[in-house]
């Protein structure tokens, strides 16, 4: 804990509000709310914490707080601050998933569409549906039952839907506004839960057609009834009151929280939503934040009623969302809550099993690697590899592994600038110098371990630059390969010595993954550069083809092979004069 934080902790008030944790770059990394700011914020810097909370605390270099007049005001402010800053440790709804809706468009001749975007365009929206397949199946059923227009744009003649009796063909025939209004009202009634009434009406029409010996017509009605049953009645009836409601329950353990949401539509459980995230404070407070974000971020429509557990502040949710909130004590609604809680508990159990397996491959591996190398646990590993063919187009690449996993946003590619010919040692010196000069200049995080895909010479070159030029003390190890180009040994120390690792150990497998990844990244970059060089060379010396036109041709065709397949006319279409295009075609065919 630094001096600035100590001084600020002493000034925290006994009032509700929000706090913003910041890292060394002054970036907001976590936002929280508290009933009493002094108690909540101080708790982060006292006592023991689990590993993930300790990781958060270790990154905090400063914090700010905003006092509010009430808990509900703090909750609303917290939601807005999370939206504004998108902190990396507020991960509960990062996917920002949107659900599909069925829309009746507001047009002269309306149509049905499935969409994830709800706009203020006077169209009628129904949903949300649990997935796009459910929405499409329902739309397909409605298309069979109600002959609204199907085409995005009205064609010049009738289409197949007209001949199937599924469209009135407003493209050719006059369809009145009254007819369209009646159809949209019928669809609206159906989507609002009136499909049982529609089914009864179809059954009556089927019976009437059968009595009148109109057997083909009766068969059509029978098929429509079957479509309704197969599409709308797959789910078991959960509640008989036909009220749309969302059921929330949660479970927490070992610093993680799982929230399960059951979507009840027209009395049926149609789908669920599962969210799992790290827990940094009391579960009931985290749940309040979750439920506020759930309806503000995920494009969810508020149902008529929400069911929540007894442990939750019901009044605060009602004030926040302006919706009817229930905490049932018995009966079918209570059973739904218990079922959601059971699912949340099972999901956490499954999560922990997967975490344990994953941690053995990642966190467990880096901890064992640190012990084997006699260094601190290398949470951040940066690995380097060179690539060239007899000194042409020399490049280097760096990959980053955080907590034993690749962090591709931080991968870097380097064109070698100061070295000529096949000089791996000189190339490594240049790249290490460029990388860590920038790290020092921009105050970026230093790695806990640097891995060099190479032997003693390259490791020594890297160490010389780090220690003697930049004054850095970072462990450097070399990844040595055997005759079959497989990870064989690890070099570290001064003087460099081989560290033996069990070949079937997780730390050895981790090194293999890192070595394979940095090699893949370097090779792919080198091939990319060679492809560009080959492309440039075949165009050299052609009159009228300068750097700009080379870039244009490369961007359009992508490779020499594809450009050789092009005609002068194809090249001319790029805005290149025909005469120049013909010269290019001739040069490529030589």
UniProtKB/Swiss-Prot annotation:
UniProt keyword annotations, A-Z: Cytoplasm, DNA damage, DNA excision, DNA repair, Excision nuclease, SOS response
What is one Pfam family matched by this protein?
UvrC_RNaseH_dom
Domain UVR, first and last residues per copy: 196-231
Gene3D superfamilies on file? 5' to 3' exonuclease, C-terminal subdomain, GIY-YIG endonuclease, UVR domain, UvrC, RNAse H endonuclease domain
Calcium is among the record's keywords: no
Q: Which residues cross the membrane?
A: none
Q: Which domain of life is it from?
A: Bacteria
SMART domains linked: GIYc
What are the record's GO terms for cellular component? Answer: cytoplasm; excinuclease repair complex
Record-level Gene Ontology MF annotations: DNA binding; excinuclease ABC activity
Organism, by scientific name, is: Bacillus licheniformis (strain ATCC 14580 / DSM 13 / JCM 2505 / CCUG 7422 / NBRC 12200 / NCIMB 9375 / NCTC 10341 / NRRL NRS-1264 / Gibson 46)
Q: Where is it localised? A: Cytoplasm
Q: Describe the protein's quaternary organization and the partners it interacts with.
A: Interacts with UvrB in an incision complex.
Q: Which GO terms describe its biological process?
A: nucleotide-excision repair; SOS response
Q: What is this protein called?
A: UvrABC system protein C
Similarity comment text for this entry = Belongs to the UvrC family.
- Predominant subcellular localization, coarse grouping: cytoplasm
- What does this chain do? The UvrABC repair system catalyzes the recognition and processing of DNA lesions. UvrC both incises the 5' and 3' sides of the lesion. The N-terminal half is responsible for the 3' incision and the C-terminal half is responsible for the 5' incision.
Q: Which InterPro entries match?
A: GIY-YIG_endonuc, GIY-YIG_endonuc_sf, GIY-YIG_UvrC_Cho, RuvA_2-like, UVR_dom, UVR_dom_sf, UvrABC_protein_C, UvrC
**What residues does the GIY-YIG domain cover?**
14-91
